[in-house]
Amino acid sequence: MKRSIVTGGGNNDKKFKAQPPPKNNYRGGGDDEEDDEFEEDDDEDEGDEFGEEEDEDDIDVENIIASDSMDIDIQDDGSQQLFLWSRKPVQDLVPHKKPLIFQQLEVDYTEIKEPVPGMPGPKVGPLPAIRLFGVTKEGNSVLCKVHGFLPYFFISCPPGFTEADCKSLKHDLNESMKMSSNQSNEKDIENIVVSIDIEKKKSIMGYNPNPLSDFIRITLILPKFVTRCREIFESGRHHFTIPGQPFRQYQTYESNILFALRFLIDKGITGCSWIELPANTYKLSETPVSTCQIEVDTSLETIISLSDDDSPAPYRILSFDIECAGRKGVFPEPEKDPVIQISNIVKNNGDAEPFIKNIFTLKGCSSIVGAHVIPHKREEDLLREWRKFVIKVDPDVIIGYNIVNFDIPYLISRARQLKIPEFALLGRIKTTISKIKSTRFSSSNLGTRESKEISMPGRTQFDLMQAIQRDHKLTSYSLNNVSAHFLKEQKEDVHFSIISDLQNGTDDDRRRLAVYCIKDAVLPMRLLDKLMILINYTEMARVTGVPLSYLLGRGEGIKVLSQLYRKAMVENFLIPTYKVTGKGEKFQGAIVIEPTPGFYDTPIATLDFTSLYPSIMMAHNLCYSTLLSAEEAKKLPPEIYTTTPFGDHFIKSDTKKGLLPRILEELLSARKKAKDELKNEKDPFKRAVLDGRQLALKISANSVYGFTGARVGKLPCLEISRSVTSFGREMLDKTKKIVEERYTIANGYKHDAVIIYGDTDSVMVKFGVKTVAEAMEMGRDAAKFVTTTFIRPINLDFEKVYYPYLLMAKKKYAGLYWTKPDIHDRMDVKGLEMVRRDTCLLVRNVVSTILKKILIEKDLKSAEEYTKSVISDLLQNRLDLSMLVITKALSKTQYKGKVIHNELARKMRARDPATAPNLGDRVPYVVIQGSKGAPIYEKAEDPLYALEHNILLDCQYYLDKQLKAPLIRIFKPIMSNPDLIFHGEHTRTIAQSTLSDNNKGFFGTLKKKKVCMNCPKELTDTESTTCINCQHKEASLYQTSLEKVTSLETKFSEAWTQCQRCSGSLHQPVLCSNRDCPIFYMRTKVQLDLIEAKKTLNRFNVEW
């Protein structure tokens, strides 16, 4: 059941009252860090909680575990199923003889009450322990607890402060920390501040030719104390002073980095890397706290990070989906509506097929080929058994579609309502319940989205909906539309309003629901494989060094910050902690050389700068550590620094190479290596890994510039970002000047070259030659020559030729794309409506067809005639509703004015809050006819509502506001007067609505009066079909009506059969309401047309 709607959480029943967890057991998954330590990306914001969250101290975990039977109640081939579910047993693990090697997938930390004997660190608790969850090559699950790592941060060392002052500072800071605490148990901790040390470092901000200077390192006992201690220094909290120093505020360094990420950076471990624990450096946990097969304790000092070139481990992936039985007209709510089915698909990473496909059902269900049906009599049993199934299968990664915002929260809230406390123990830590909190994520690329964050230690939740929203721009993100787009297949969508009827029906009815539910678990797994999503994200985690779970829940900044911290640590640089304000000076973006619009029937060569922004940063050594102020620059010889076109100053690389340029060099060098290996690799799986790696490296390199320019980022630097774009503008102008001055008739060439357009990193050159081969030759020569005028590694590359080329405006063009002189690769379109998401399908299809006729067929007359026929069909309501649906993202809750999709969302919320669009969703709508002068936002309507209520669309709006502008843009460079396309015989017949008793009029014209079927004459009471003057044509009219009914019946039968095939049965009625499927609207339209056609045919009073 895939819905983008998220309903409220659980009840307020404080059923579980708690005892503390058993001694030496671990109690949580890093949820004790203070809030702002989790705000790793500045575009995150925490919202209200989902339902009610219980702390672990509110749950009697001890009693739950004691009463939690893991006996699984399944029928028929139960022993075989249990064997399939279980992992392979561990073989020959002898800690003092053999190393333990595993791939870590999830990293977090917990607090332990007492230290583990033999492990480093303080000898009195509480203490933090890093937890690495992973899988061995044999497929065994691992929990490795790393001891001895403590949180720390730095402050600048005041003058006169020495090693002798460290002890008194530690004492005073401990006292201040205890005074500021409102927790009694914190006051009992002897040393919140574990140590004060002086280290030689330097700040990354600004060029500093001097040697390293003193900084104070403050080490604390637990991560949750970092924020409070930082505030003491930054804000002068409690007027704290360093002994012997006047009262002042201090700049802190590296005080807002997540504790688990700090560990990975300090140990040189990347996300999803392989870990080795050498023999005799680890021991099996005496009191296991997890459900992992292997649980060990080890020291911080002995853990080893291995090369990340090895193949991924065979980790287990669970894809699941749930179905709920809602009440009539109400979207399911966990407080009231039962979970009736849960489907599951399980496979090992790297395998082609799943080894588990089953479905847990409430009540009986007919058998399903290829799936194991596990029925239950009570909902409580279904939920308990499914949770046991999850624990038994022990998945490393849980996937699905919208599971984070719907399925998992619904299951947890429903179990709470049914008083099943053990259900929330879904993670791998036996005493840690899964908690849910609401978050709000914002970024310039992705907009604002509300989401949930679910703690499930040891299991990575990977919501395919979130991944696809991040990586692909689609008109709709429903599972139906995504599957149609990527897998080229539609799926049946059973509306939630009829699910209860199916559930209350027969075993066969529930089987139909089960087939639908299973498909919603199968499709995410297929999308995962098709798009190589997990492979690509795993490689991104390795490249950037962050845990896999950070990549979906956080923005781009965390990835760059991780790389910057790693490089800074090696160089003894410190990264300052700044308050995020979201304010700052804006700067001019990239230049666009003004286009010369036209239809070019000669080849246009395109020259592209390779990795433009990274290349500029490397060429000019742009970095935090090389930045000079104007005053500092005046004191230095001008030959050792660069002055950017914007007037900023940076030290040149031969004096001091910056960290950012070195990071970029390593990323691009590694990408080149991955691409070279990809060319020679034959194994499909290894090819996918290498391709994912080179893509991750490319994205990471391109993200560095954006990181410096993010005004709400962790380390914004306007001087870097504006310098990059100013160099880019200068380079485009220089390229234009060189090409137009060199390739001229005066210099011996056949034509004068002209730059007809330039945008950010590309220039389009008209050399005047007649063939693609000639344009390619001159393009290569020009790229090579211009490159010699720039500083390395800036490189201008010839990439392609457009021929023919239709240039309409800035960022709006189309052409045939050639990389070989003999045949074009494809039709390439930029900025036009066929690639935009805020236009209806009609516009995209029409623009695409017209461009094919102009560019490929080179038949302008055919393009004109086709356009006129579409306009005629539109004005006469002969088009499917699916062609006229528009979608826009709901990115804000409040807009300055009345915005069409926001107003529709309000209207839908008033009708049914449960099914209304949420923040971040794309809102589909159609424009209906309204009163004269009505604003457009009043005429927006939900397509399904319009369909069900037979509301006539405003076809004139679609012509004037959707079709006309893009068509004028296309035809203007080709025709002398493109407006003529919108006038003429084909525009004279326009469908009008005359309301009948039942308010019909959605797809056709309805008449008030009974008139002759051949002429406009009104009929008498004795006439039913034709007037007396047209009676001789009655037979012909009858034949036409009969043929129309027959044709519509055939169309309806074909649509009905197609829908039946999609549902998996040719013997059951069609229930699908997939609004992303054009067949759904076509079937309904044909059905309505057929009703009207039969009414017309019945006027002939023919006896059958």
Curated annotation (Swiss-Prot):
Segments forming CysA-type zinc fingers: 1012-1030
Top EC class of this enzyme = transferase
Q: What does UniProt give as GO cellular component?
A: delta DNA polymerase complex
Q: Which organism is it from?
A: Dictyostelium discoideum
State the oligomer form and interacting partners: Heterotetramer composed of subunits of 125 kDa, 50 kDa, 66 kDa and 12 kDa. The 125 kDa subunit contains the polymerase active site and most likely the active site for the 3'-5' exonuclease activity.
Motif CysB motif, per the record, lies over 1059-1077
The protein in question is named DNA polymerase delta catalytic subunit
Show the InterPro entries listed in the entry. DNA-dir_DNA_pol_B, DNA-dir_DNA_pol_B_CS, DNA-dir_DNA_pol_B_exonuc, DNA-dir_DNA_pol_B_multi_dom, DNA/RNA_pol_sf, DNA_pol_B_thumb, DNA_pol_palm_dom_sf, DNA_pol_type-B
Catalytic reaction equation(s): DNA(n) + a 2'-deoxyribonucleoside 5'-triphosphate = DNA(n+1) + diphosphate
According to the UniProt entry, its GO molecular function terms are: 3'-5'-DNA exonuclease activity; 4 iron, 4 sulfur cluster binding; DNA binding; DNA-directed DNA polymerase activity; nucleotide binding; zinc ion binding
Q: What is known of its domains?
A: The CysB motif binds 1 4Fe-4S cluster and is required for the formation of polymerase complexes.
Q: Which gene encodes it?
A: pold1
